[in-house]
């Protein structure tokens, strides 16, 4: 019997440990009520791979040629099954020791209507203003930055939400035109956009919106972007927003996607960065260019015959994955940790909108089930939410981004286990694992746990248990069905990478940072493959059941498909770990626009507030005029004091604390750092300080941005002239 999957785990030559079935017997997805490890006996959340019993294998929807089967793939399947059995045994053992609590019980899917899910989606992407009706600056600013595909995705969800509300509400009062049959205008001119938005492509002038220029071209840059309820004047400044009763959603612009910054397209590519820099062996000669400058959903929409792709063969060998050549623009590349917390929150909102629009382009609905929130434990280590662990750890180290206990597990394995054969296939000593778990829960936060006595095998076992027992999966399992549908349409690895890239950007901060550290750690394990026999395929096979789990009920066949896809996703994460956590530049451009729009909107007082506060404001202005001499604001004073093309860089931690630097088209961030290093090279301590220093742009249209050493500062200066420039760790 052969069960194969081109999208993840290769299921070949499966050998049942039970009695062999008669020849010709077909695999079946039967009920497992009689199985000793049935649902009732597993109090913990239902793992997506619990279905891999010896009698319930069923072919997934993917197929592979028989020539691709190998002994290695059969061994990988056996590893997968052993990991499932280990999870089942640990789950049963835990249930016998203590009764399940409400926090640990499986959360069942609640029957909810589509409107509730769309309302939750709108809240998750930062558009709760559309539900509450409040004129919030952040929501309006976010809407003003959306591309065509992103705006269409928001409109679609908002329409579903409003339609559901109308069905729930009582019969509305009949319109006078319904009574007398008056119809003076065609239906297309009816004014119902406050409750439902249509998908027409015709552009209409909106009341209260000032337009000063013709429609934007497709290659418009950031400097020519028109914001919702506002426009640019000829000098590039924004015209003040007009007050009125314009609905927030009416102002969603039908704008083209823009390149990052104002640099010409021909000059945008300064150098290339290949994933081969990080995985330098067994790379095929074919390579594909990967751009972060253009919205992925816009790129997919413009692809001809995107629904007629030929299915790509996904083989076991890691070297057959596409080699990507990444465009490195004049603004450099940005890691997730290079941006401020507030800006990363905006990135997360935009990424979820972009991910939804990306799947919409393929006709795939990004469905999410509404489940009961599992709170988890408030203390200890295992079963505690990542956010709670980080809150406790930040009392010791405010800068920590990955739970300290997880870092200890990594360190323990790296000390003596990287060359240990089958390090993540071994189960370790059960008695010791149980003892260490209890001691960690009781003593770790008090720094009383003795790490010297722990073996690397037990550390590896507890690392898997740590992720398996999280209240919620490290990676959202609800995205997997959409990823399965994407793979069934047969797009190449590049499209799969783009979907996965947006998934990573949409993760909560704690999950995203932890996942990055985990993938970096596993790549260290894979680097010692010749000694530990743990390659990319083995790691993804063993870790899939621990990193992805579902609290929803699925048939065994569905869960098999979910498991295979989860394995493939981990494999992609491991292969492209160095580039998946780089923020796409088109999202950074949208964040800059959003910050500019927020500052503009905050200057505008609602008409009612203006009316109520007019006398108070006039009195305050008169007092200021008589008591103080008008002074320039710090930003205007700074701009007037510093000539064009000259920036003042501050280095508060160095002996040379400030320096004015004349920029030219070739000045890079590393050149500025080199100048400060030369000026502060009098002592060895100053030299050590400079090794950890980076150049930041702070303020203006960005919260804080740690610049790539290869970024051209004049280009950054042009898109953010009001920023301050600071050198710090």
Swiss-Prot record:
Pfam family, one: Ubiquitin_RHG40_C
Domain Rho-GAP span(s) in chain numbering: 384-581
Gene Ontology cellular-component terms listed: cell junction; nucleoplasm
Biased composition (Basic residues): 37-49
Modification sites for Phosphoserine: 70
Secreted recorded as keyword: no
Ranges for region Disordered: 1-78, 180-234
Record-linked CDD domains: RhoGAP_ARHGAP18
GO biological process: negative regulation of stress fiber assembly; signal transduction
Function comment: GTPase activator for the Rho-type GTPases by converting them to an inactive GDP-bound state.
Name of this protein: Rho GTPase-activating protein 28
Gene that this sequence comes from: Arhgap28
């Amino acid at each position: 019997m052969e069960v194969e999957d081109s999208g993840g785990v290769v299921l070949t030559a499966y050998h049942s440990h039970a009695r062999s079935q008669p020849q010709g017997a077909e695999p079946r997805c039967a009920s497992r009520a009689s199985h000793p490890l049935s649902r009732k006996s597993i109090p913990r959340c239902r793992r997506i791979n619990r279905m891999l019993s010896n009698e319930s294998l069923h072919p997934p929807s993917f197929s592979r040629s028989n020539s691709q089967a190998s002994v290695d793939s059969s061994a990988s399947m056996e590893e997968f099954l052993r990991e499932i059995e280990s999870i089942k045994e640990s789950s049963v053992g835990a249930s016998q020791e203590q009764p399940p609590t409400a926090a640990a019980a499986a959360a069942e899917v609640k029957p909810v209507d589509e409107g509730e899910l769309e309302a939750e989606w709108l809240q998750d992407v930062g558009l709760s203003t559309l539900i509450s009706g409040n004129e919030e600056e952040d929501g309006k600013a976010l809407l003003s930055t959306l591309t065509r595909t992103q705006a269409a995705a928001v409109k679609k969800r908002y329409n579903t939400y409003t339609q559901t509300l109308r069905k729930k509400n009582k019969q509305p009062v009949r319109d006078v035109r319904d009574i007398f049959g008056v119809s003076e205008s065609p239906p297309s001119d009816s004014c119902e956009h406050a409750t439902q938005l249509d998908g027409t492509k015709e552009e209409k002038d909106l009341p209260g919106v000032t337009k000063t220029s013709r429609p934007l071209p497709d290659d418009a840059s950031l400097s020519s972007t028109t914001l919702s309820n506002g426009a640019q004047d000829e000098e590039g400044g924004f015209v003040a927003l007009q007050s009125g009763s314009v609905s927030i959603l009416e102002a969603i612009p039908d704008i083209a996607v823009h390149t990052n910054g104002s640099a010409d397209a021909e000059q945008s590519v300064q150098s290339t960065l290949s994933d081969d820099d990080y995985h330098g062996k067994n790379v095929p000669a074919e390579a594909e260019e990967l751009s972060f400058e253009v919205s992925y959903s816009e790129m997919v929409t413009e692809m001809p015959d995107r629904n007629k792709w030929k299915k790509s063969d996904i083989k076991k060998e890691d070297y057959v994955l596409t080699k990507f050549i990444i465009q490195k623009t004049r603004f450099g590349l940005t890691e997730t940790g290079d941006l401020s917390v507030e800006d990363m929150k905006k990135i997360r909102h935009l990424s979820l909108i972009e991910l939804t629009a990306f799947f919409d382009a393929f006709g795939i609905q990004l469905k999410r089930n509404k489940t009961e929130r599992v709170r988890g434990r408030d203390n200890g280590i295992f079963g505690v939410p990542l956010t709670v662990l980080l809150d406790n750890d930040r009392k010791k180290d405010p800068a920590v981004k990955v739970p300290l206990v997880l870092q200890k597990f990594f360190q323990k394995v790296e000390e003596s286990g990287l060359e240990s054969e089958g390090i993540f296939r071994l189960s370790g000593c059960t008695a010791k694992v149980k003892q260490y778990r209890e001691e960690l829960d009781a003593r770790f936060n008090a720094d009383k746990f003795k790490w010297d006595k722990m073996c690397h095998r037990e550390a590896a076992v507890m690392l898997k248990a740590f992720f398996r027992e999280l209240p919620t999966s490290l990676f959202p399992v609800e995205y997997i069905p959409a990823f399965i549908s994407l793979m069934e349409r047969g797009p190449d690895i590049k499209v799969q990478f783009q979907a996965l890239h947006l998934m990573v950007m949409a993760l909560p901060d704690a999950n995203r940072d932890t996942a990055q550290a985990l993938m970096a750690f596993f790549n260290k394990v894979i680097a010692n493959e010749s000694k530990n026999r743990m390659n990319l395929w083995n790691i993804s096979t063993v870790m899939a059941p621990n990193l992805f789990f579902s609290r929803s009920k699925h048939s065994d066949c569905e869960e098999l498909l979910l498991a295979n896809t989860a394995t493939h996703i981990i494999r992609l994460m491991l292969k492209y770990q160095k580039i998946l956590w780089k923020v796409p530049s088109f999202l950074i451009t949208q964040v800059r626009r959003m910050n500019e729009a927020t500052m503009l909107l905050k200057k505008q007082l609602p008409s009612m507030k203006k009316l109520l506060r007019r006398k108070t404001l006039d009195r305050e202005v008169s007092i200021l005029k008589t008591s103080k001499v008008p002074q320039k604001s710090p930003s205007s004073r700074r701009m007037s004091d510093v000539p064009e093309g000259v920036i003042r860089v501050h280095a508060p931690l160095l002996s040379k604390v400030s320096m004015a630097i004349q920029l030219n088209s070739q000045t890079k961030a590393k050149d500025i750092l080199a100048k400060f290093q030369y000026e502060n090279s009098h002592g060895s301590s100053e030299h050590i300080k400079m090794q950890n220093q980076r150049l930041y742009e702070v303020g203006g249209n960005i919260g804080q941005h740690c610049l790539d050493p290869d970024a051209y500062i004049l280009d950054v200066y042009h898109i953010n002239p009001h920023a301050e420039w600071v050198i710090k760790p």
